[in-house]
């Protein structure tokens, strides 16, 4: 049964991160109209039908959600009762350059968690993320001033981070917040074994996200075809890394009708990497 979803509310970004794996999927990214309100209504109906106590929802995907902040607010308002009751646990992930006090206050008031992408050491972050380090750090401190603690942080782990693992771990220790380390994939990617070895080390010192059947990119097992889905480009996909695979249905499909014929595979591995071998 589906209990979590991510919605990509746009396909555009104000940065040009060198490692962004969507650069390699341009033919699969398109601006087909997608009724996010209908999607949210389907999620609401699914929650009611199955009496779900918790549904996890991310406003995250192919682009920078803060570029369409007015639209994001309208989606949040549409499910505000479910957010405030805790039935939907919602979050968004931003590159951190478009944050301001009012936006932080709005999302916090509506119980939408904010994750900020920060690749650790300044020279590593700037190499990959369009020299945005200073702006991102300023806004992380702004978040702390507004909310009283640091936000969840997302760090993409490539060879640069592996080569300076101890320094990177020490860098994140100052924040005391939950860290999601993401395995760099695509042409600059690292192996799953390298990534998991880094996670094992980081988890000795940091509050590191390591899920169950979620995603190998974040240190869990692959949940493709199980309980989570990804909305983008007018479609529902088996996962955000698989928008270029033939596993999709229309974005307005009721959740009970979303069935992907994912074959049996070893879920310590990434389905995308298994399917494209």
Model-predicted regions and their roles:
Residues 1-37:
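Canonical Radical SAM [4Fe-4S] cluster-binding loop centered on the CxxxCxxC motif
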Residues 11, 15, 123, 237:
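Glycine-centered loop/turn positions within well-structured domains
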Residues 24-28, 121-123, 186-187:
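A short, flexible beta-alpha/helix-coil linker loop
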Residues 33-39, 237-240:
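Short cysteine/histidine-rich metal-coordination sites, predominantly Zn2+-binding motifs
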Residues 37-62, 68-184:
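Radical SAM/AdoMet-radical enzyme domain recognition
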Residues 115-117, 152-154, 178-182, 207-212, ...:
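A structural signal for short, well-ordered beta-strand segments and their strand-loop junctions
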Residues 178-197, 210-221, 246:
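Flexible glycine/acidic-rich beta-alpha junction loops that bind and position SAM and/or redox cofactors
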Residues 209-277:
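Accessory C-terminal segments flanking Radical SAM cores
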């Amino acid at each position: 049964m589906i209990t979590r979803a991510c919605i990509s509310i746009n396909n555009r970004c104000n940065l040009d991160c060198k490692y962004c794996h969507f650069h390699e999927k341009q033919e699969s990214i398109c601006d087909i109209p997608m009724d996010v309100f209908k999607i949210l209504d389907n999620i609401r109906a699914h929650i009611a039908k199955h009496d779900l106590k918790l549904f996890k929802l991310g406003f995250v995907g192919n682009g920078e959600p803060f570029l369409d902040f007015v639209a994001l607010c309208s989606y949040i308002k549409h499910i505000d009762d479910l957010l405030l009751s805790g039935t939907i646990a919602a979050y968004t992930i931003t590159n951190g350059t478009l944050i301001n006090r009012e936006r932080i206050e709005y999302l916090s008031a509506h119980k939408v968690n904010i994750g900020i992408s920060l690749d650790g050491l300044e020279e590593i972050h700037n190499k990959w993320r369009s020299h945005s380090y200073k702006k991102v750090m300023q806004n992380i401190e702004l978040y702390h001033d507004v909310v009283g603690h640091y936000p969840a942080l997302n760090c993409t782990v490539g060879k640069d981070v592996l080569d300076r693992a101890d320094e990177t771990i020490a860098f994140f220790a100052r924040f005391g917040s939950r860290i999601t380390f993401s395995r760099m994939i695509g042409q600059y990617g690292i192996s799953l074994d390298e990534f998991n070895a880094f996670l094992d080390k980081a988890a000795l010192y940091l509050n590191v996200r390591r899920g169950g059947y979620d995603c190998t990119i974040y240190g869990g097992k692959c949940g493709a075809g199980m309980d989570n889905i990804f909305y983008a480009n007018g479609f529902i996909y088996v996962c955000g890394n698989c928008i270029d695979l033939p596993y999709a249905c229309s974005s307005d499909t009721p959740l009970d009708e979303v069935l992907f014929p994912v074959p049996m595979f070893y879920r310590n591995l990434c389905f995308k990497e298994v399917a494209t071998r």
